[in-house]
Amino acid sequence: GIPANNSSDPRHSAFADAEFSPGSDGSISLWSNMLGLAATFSPETVEEFGRIAREEYRALGLATALSPQADLGTDPRWYRYSSTFGPEPRLVTDLTRAYADGFQTDPTAGGWGNGSVNAMVKHWPGGGSGEGGRDAHYGNGKFAVYPGGCYEQHKIPFLEGAFKLTGGTEKASAVMPYYTISY
């Protein structure tokens, strides 16, 4: 047969109604969105969320999480702002690392194992800098802007967070690029 890799956008926030319908098995756990998790200032809490979500994803037959969203939320007008860990590079880096470690690290294997869920970090090279807060999923949001020349800052959560995990998997397994023209 043809191998399948079922994936999902985040589904644990209060808006967890897009694809998952609770059946006789009960419901999936509900957590704050990413910005709410960031408000804890706790990589340990975010990693614990990742471990719980990993188990639930595997139970649902999901092998890849289309997350974490490692974008620096530099423009609060962006409608995806609440899906970020906020605007502060160090905090976003630490929480991105914790999130990916929680999803990917199978404790029985000390790294990759049957319980692992791939973390697809997004949106390279940083989607939170859309011109005027506009989103790149639409034509009017095709340009990323980096006021003050802070392009390099937007890459920090990827280069120092998602690609330098502390768990046995070492780095996020996948990267989702963004649709912007980044300059």
Predicted regions and their residues:
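Glycoside hydrolase catalytic-domain context in secreted enzymes
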Residues: 1-183
